[in-house]
Amino acid sequence: MPPEDRIRLRHMLEAIENASSFITERKRGDLDSDKMLLFALVRCVEIVGEAASRLSGNAQDSAPTIPWAAIVGMRNRLIHAYFDVDTEIVWKTVTVEFPALAIQLRRLPLNEA
């Protein structure tokens, strides 16, 4: 796997890990009252989507069970419809989808030459 792909995959994992740390001891309702938390989580989702969009086709093909188009689509939705962010979807993405995605990403050759 080219170094650029490995870097982007690591960026995805770092953003997922950051999101996980941000929600420690938090509840869904905190997104409604804590704008900084919401902005931080949205940014993590954007980074995951942007990094995914810049992966080579070969990198994406090496993990066909990862929903690459949906990941990139989520990023695009957050960027272009910033005025209409669904906090339920952000919370589900970070609490349900991200942990599952992290497991899949860790199976990829992130440190190989």
How should these model regions be labeled?
Residues 1-113:
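Solvent-exposed interaction patches of small proteins and small membrane subunits
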